[in-house]
């Protein structure tokens, strides 16, 4: 049964504010930044904290779609376009799904065959204004995730960029510091020995350290899906629906996962009820199984999302060679270490 997206028709974005709680105990470890540490800030309600940044959440929304045991997308999503990078022996190295800069990864740029040159040629950007429809069609062909998580093809042309159409972050409000500490014990020689060169710098001796964790009155996962941007790609009804469903599938898969962000940072949903949208009252985030349903005896998943993937990747007898050439595909390149 198709997922009803009609409540979204008159809206330009879809917002969720998902209440979370610490899975065990009260303390949690937020993300940290070099020379800054935890990102605390003041709001009218008091002291708040950035628990997980937008860039980190983009990686996590990708990770729930990736199967590390097979180095491929999770089975219901296989067929979606991305670039796989292998070494000269044919072993998997990385992919555009996993790379921080996606298509602009140096492992793709410096690989063979020259995928970047092929992409640049298909975009047709050299010494010309950006042909936006041609640009997004090319990105769809090689890495559909870039249309959701954004991409900046700086090494090709500084004008080739797409903003995120799904963005998420986690904040905590009413935070307080939970100070603690620990010690690294040296079982052989607890005291330092400067004369012998056995100092803390080299890792010798007992090394005490401070540790700051946090408690919070409220923890919230904020998510925004830019429906106007997705529709503005002009890629047709099927691709537009695929992108919206894929964005929602990523969010649902993340909140259904253990949400263990770090060693001392595990969350779960605070409320067990339906996840309703903040700005579209009649829309609730579907359950994960609603997107993919079940795997049939023929190996195909019967849900609408995998069905759309098959429709948009499989060749149809009536299609022209030009249309077939624009379809999503898995591209494999080789990077020599």
Locate the predicted segments by residue.
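Basic polyanion-binding and macromolecular-assembly surfaces
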Residues: 1-30, 35-49, 70-73, 78-85, ...
């Amino acid at each position: 049964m198709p997922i009803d997206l009609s409540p979204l028709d008159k809206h330009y974005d879809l917002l969720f504010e998902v209440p979370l709680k610490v899975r065990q105990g009260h303390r949690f470890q937020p993300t940290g930044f070099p020379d800054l540490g935890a990102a605390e800030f003041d709001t009218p309600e008091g002291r708040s904290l950035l628990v997980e940044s937008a860039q980190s959440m983009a990686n996590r929304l990708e990770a729930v779609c990736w199967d590390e045991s097979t180095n491929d997308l999770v089975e219901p999503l296989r067929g979606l376009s991305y670039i796989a990078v292998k070494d000269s022996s044919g072993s998997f190295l990385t992919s555009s799904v996993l790379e921080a800069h996606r298509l602009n990864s140096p492992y793709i740029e410096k690989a063979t065959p020259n995928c970047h040159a092929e992409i640049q040629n298909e975009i047709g950007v050299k010494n010309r204004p950006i042909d936006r429809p041609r640009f997004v069609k090319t990105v769809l062909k090689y890495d559909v995730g870039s249309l959701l998580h954004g991409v900046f093809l700086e090494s090709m042309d500084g004008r080739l960029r797409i903003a995120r159409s799904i963005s998420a972050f986690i904040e905590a409000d009413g935070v307080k510091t939970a100070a603690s500490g620990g010690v690294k014990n040296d079982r052989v020689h607890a005291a330092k020995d400067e004369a012998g060169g056995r100092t803390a710098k080299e890792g010798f001796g007992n090394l005490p350290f401070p540790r700051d964790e946090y408690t919070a009155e409220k923890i919230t996962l904020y998510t925004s899906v830019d429906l106007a941007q997705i529709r503005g790609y002009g890629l047709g009804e099927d691709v537009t629906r695929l992108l919206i469903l894929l964005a929602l599938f990523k969010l649902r898969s993340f909140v259904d996962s253990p949400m263990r962000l770090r060693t001392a940072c595990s969350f779960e949903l605070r409320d067990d009820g339906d996840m309703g949208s903040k700005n579209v009252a009649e829309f609730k985030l579907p359950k994960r199984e609603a997107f993919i349903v079940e795997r049939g005896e023929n190996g195909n998943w019967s849900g609408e999302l995998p069905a759309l993937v098959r429709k948009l990747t499989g060749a149809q007898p009536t299609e022209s060679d030009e249309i077939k050439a624009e379809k999503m595909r898995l591209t494999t390149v080789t990077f020599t270490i």
